[in-house]
């Protein structure tokens, strides 16, 4: 069985140790000969890499390991690039959230003006990594789960149309894990789903078990009362702010009881509620910096100090095993059915053919083959057309360095009440993003 060489782009991420543990747990399905970390923040990466090197020595000493800030070293001789980068780190995420909130607008990592700001920072970073991969390992595939996935996917479609990149998001997986629990199933893989939308902006229209029995009525009964709140939930989304999001799904569901919604629709359909329940001084970014970031870096430092993982509390990110499913589908032509973000090309009959949609695909050695979704209802179509236009305008603004188009993008977001407020937020975002955005004219 071939052994693979993998580079993790974003080696200094708080998610990296959990993903490394997950890869080690799946070595029987996806054997690795070489694992590399790449990051442009040497100090930050050194802490995570130092701990991961010890984890590897203990669990899989045969794997060759390297952490580097040198693109040539990182991207030469790799089969897969697994990318989770955060340009500007959590300090910039904090501003993405707090600046819009100052104006009474949703402040969120991937939705509204904050998501647009993050997108403007991320496009260049993801394109750069893609270019390194194509230069040094032209046969490799990039598995990208960097946020904001919708804008990043649109950017790769428009700016690098022939590149071997698969854009995937873990949010539907987290929700499906909860659905499986609500239904009393062992795993979300016992369900076959139909889902359509944009990234962080979609709906389940059909969910069946392996025998073809319709599971929607039972799920709807639960969601109508409790949202996606479940006993155990998924391992990824556990904080108090997430619990509110899963509970609020019942109100999002009520707007269209014929489908089951992605939780992120709360930000677009109930922005007033979101702002009202936000703390302008302490946002999700603060929660993460004080929670996961301190925890992960604290644990990594302990592992390095003890030169051992004994007593280490870092856990496998089990729900990240979708990354292995995707790599296996490409490597072994497994024809796994997965939700990916792909050009619509008529899959949704009555929607923009160039829009990047999130739909089920059959994945094999040549990449994804999107399934046909047919026509979608007017309500979803209307919301999606507005949102896909936001995403396209952001990418055009980045490419053309256009102030006008970015103002239009923010104005068009459902989360923003007027062009005046959009301009105020934009001008403040430009100030703080000088080191990250192209200079707009």
Curated annotation (Swiss-Prot):
Cofactor note: Binds 1 NAD(+) per subunit. Binds 1 Mn(2+) ion per subunit.
Catalysed reaction equations from the record: alpha-maltose 6'-phosphate + H2O = D-glucose 6-phosphate + D-glucose
GO biological process, one term: carbohydrate metabolic process
Any one GO MF annotation of this record: metal ion binding
SUPFAM superfamilies: LDH C-terminal domain-like (SSF56327), NAD(P)-binding Rossmann-fold domains (SSF51735)
Site residues, Increases basicity of active site Tyr: 109
Family classification: Belongs to the glycosyl hydrolase 4 family.
Name by which UniProt lists this protein: Maltose-6'-phosphate glucosidase MalH
Organism field: Clostridium acetobutylicum (strain ATCC 824 / DSM 792 / JCM 1419 / IAM 19013 / LMG 5710 / NBRC 13948 / NRRL B-527 / VKM B-1787 / 2291 / W)
């Amino acid at each position: 069985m071939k052994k693979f060489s993998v580079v993790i782009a974003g080696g200094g991420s708080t998610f990296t140790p959990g993903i490394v543990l997950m890869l080690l747990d799946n070595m029987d399905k996806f054997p690795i000969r070489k694992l590399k970390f790449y990051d442009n923040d040497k100090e930050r990466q050194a802490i995570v890499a130092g701990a991961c090197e010890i984890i590897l020595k203990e669990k899989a000493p045969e794997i060759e390991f390297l952490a580097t800030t040198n693109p040539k070293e990182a991207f030469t001789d790799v089969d897969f690039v697994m990318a989770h980068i955060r340009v500007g780190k959590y300090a910039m995420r904090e501003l993405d959230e707090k600046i819009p909130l100052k104006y009474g607008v949703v402040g969120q990592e991937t939705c509204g003006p904050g998501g647009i700001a993050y997108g403007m920072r991320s496009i260049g970073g993801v394109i750069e990594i893609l270019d390194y991969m194509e230069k040094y390992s032209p046969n490799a595939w990039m598995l990208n789960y960097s946020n904001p996935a919708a804008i990043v996917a649109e950017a790769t479609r428009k700016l690098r149309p022939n590149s071997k990149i698969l854009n995937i998001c873990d949010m539907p997986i987290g929700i499906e894990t909860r659905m499986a629990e609500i239904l009393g199933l062992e795993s979300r893989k016992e369900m076959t789903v139909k889902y359509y939308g944009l990234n962080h902006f979609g709906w389940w229209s059909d969910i069946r078990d392996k025998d073809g029995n319709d599971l929607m009525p039972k799920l709807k009964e639960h969601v109508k009362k409790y949202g996606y709140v479940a006993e155990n939930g998924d391992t990824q989304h556990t904080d108090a702010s997430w619990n509110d999001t899963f509970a609020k799904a019942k109100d999002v569901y009520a707007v269209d009881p014929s489908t089951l919604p992605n939780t992120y629709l709360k930000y677009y359909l109930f922005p007033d509620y979101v702002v009202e329940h936000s703390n302008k001084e302490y946002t999700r970014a603060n929660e993460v910096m004080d929670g996961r970031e301190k925890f992960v870096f604290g644990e990594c430092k302990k592992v390095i100090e003890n030169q051992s993982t004994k007593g280490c509390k870092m856990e496998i990110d089990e729900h990240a095993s979708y990354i292995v499913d995707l790599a296996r589908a490409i490597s072994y032509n497994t024809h796994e059915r997965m939700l990916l973000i792909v050009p619509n090309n008529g899959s949704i009959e009555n929607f923009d053919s160039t829009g990047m949609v999130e739909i089920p695909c059959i994945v094999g050695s040549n990449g994804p083959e999107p399934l046909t979704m047919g026509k979608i209802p007017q309500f979803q179509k209307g919301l999606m057309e507005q949102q896909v236009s936001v995403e396209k305008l952001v990418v055009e603004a980045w490419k053309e360095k256009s102030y006008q188009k970015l103002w239009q993008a923010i104005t068009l977001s459902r989360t923003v009440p007027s062009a005046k407020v959009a301009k105020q937020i934009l001008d403040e975002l430009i100030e703080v993003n000088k080191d990250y955005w192209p200079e707009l004219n």
